[in-house]
Amino acid sequence: IDYPAFRESVRDFLHEALTPELRRAGELTTSVFSDFDAALAWQKKLHAQGWIAPDWPKEFGGPGWDIQQRAIFQEECKLANAPSVVMMGIQMLGPMLMHYGTEDQKHHYLPRMLSGEHIWCQGYSEPGAGSDLASLKTSAIRDGSDYLVTGTKIWTSMAQHANQIFCLVRTDKSVKPQAGISFLLIELDSPGTVSYTH
């Protein structure tokens, strides 16, 4: 791989693709989250270029870059003041689905994650169960091919924008607290789901 040439191709793309508004959103990013509208607009441009998920292999829609290409891309994005992307799905859920998901789940969720059609939030913390996830109380009871989920999640980053949530729930109360926890993917427009922003 000609890394200097790759760096130039990244710079050229960033020069063309980053509007003044997107650069300004990047400048104003103070943590890992950029302005949502800017992040989604930037995600769509990177998706069209095939660069939205630098760590993902080609078989799942990533560019298949090696570690040096990923480092160059990240460095050039920072130097150009690119905003972040909508990352909860791509960086947190995507790699887990690639490894543990069924073929149907991979086929359904991964492309929508990359395109920005699905915006994900994380449903781990609860009142009384912040970093101590073994204390979580949200329950999920099997109902045919579905689950009936009852409980509350808090500190749910991106919930105000999300249409999907990956969620830890208790499915077995007969075992020790660290066991009996399952990982569910839930559509936030499911009946009975309510989201509050403070």
Explain the meaning of each model-derived region.
Residues I1-M87, M98, D104-S115, I119:
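Amphipathic, small/basic residue-rich leader segments at the start of a protein or domain
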Residues T138-A140:
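A structural signal for short hydrophobic beta-strand segments in well-ordered beta-sheet cores
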Residues E59, S125-A129, I154-W155:
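Short, solvent-exposed loop/turn elements at beta->coil junctions and helix N-caps
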Residues D146, T150-T193:
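A short core secondary-structure module
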Residues M92-Y100:
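Helix-loop "lid/cap" segments that line or gate small-molecule binding pockets
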Residues T197-H198:
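Conserved small/polar residues in nucleotide/adenosyl-binding loops
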